[in-house]
């Protein structure tokens, strides 16, 4: 794991610790206890804010909103007990493969 991954893993560990905590103790515990629909709603809101920030083109806003999106994505992963390492592994698998080849390798539905 490199230095950039460390902060994501550290945040994920805190999210996992908050999973069983009282909803009164933290925003994260409260969000996790409200359930998947609330988590997904918040994730959608944050994704929209990234889009708006991207359209505005202000670097600080893009960074700020992307950090929120990363955080709420980690909350989703924590809810389902998916370690970020699984995402890193999938990205490593795709790295160096063209998007067209990667899409062609997906199972047909």
Swiss-Prot record:
CDD domains attached to this UniProt entry: NTP-PPase_HisIE_like
Signal peptide from the UniProt entry: none
UniProt keyword annotations, A-Z: Amino-acid biosynthesis, ATP-binding, Cytoplasm, Histidine biosynthesis, Hydrolase, Nucleotide-binding
Catalytic activity: 1-(5-phospho-beta-D-ribosyl)-ATP + H2O = 1-(5-phospho-beta-D-ribosyl)-5'-AMP + diphosphate + H(+)
SUPFAM superfamilies (UniProt xref): all-alpha NTP pyrophosphatases (SSF101386)
Origin: domain of life: Bacteria
GO BP, one annotated term: L-histidine biosynthetic process
Gene Ontology molecular functions: ATP binding; phosphoribosyl-ATP diphosphatase activity
Enzyme class: hydrolase
Pathway noted in the entry: Amino-acid biosynthesis; L-histidine biosynthesis; L-histidine from 5-phospho-alpha-D-ribose 1-diphosphate: step 2/9
GO cellular component: cytoplasm
EC number(s) stated in the UniProt entry for this protein: 3.6.1.31
InterPro entries: HisE, PRib-ATP_PPHydrolase-like
Protein localization: Cytoplasm
Disulfide bridge map: none
Membership in a protein family: Belongs to the PRA-PH family.
Protein name as annotated: Phosphoribosyl-ATP pyrophosphatase
Gene that this polypeptide is encoded by: hisE
């Amino acid at each position: 794991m490199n230095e950039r991954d460390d902060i994501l893993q550290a945040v994920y560990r805190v999210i996992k610790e908050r999973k069983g905590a009282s909803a009164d103790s933290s925003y994260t515990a409260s969000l996790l206890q409200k359930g998947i629909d609330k988590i997904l709603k918040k994730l959608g809101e944050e994704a929209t804010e990234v889009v708006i920030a991207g359209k505005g083109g202000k670097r600080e806003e893009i960074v700020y909103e992307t950090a929120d999106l990363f955080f709420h994505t980690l909350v989703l992963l924590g809810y389902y007990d998916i370690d970020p390492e699984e995402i890193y592994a999938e990205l490593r698998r795709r790295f160096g493969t063209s998007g067209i080849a990667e899409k062609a390798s997906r199972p047909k539905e």
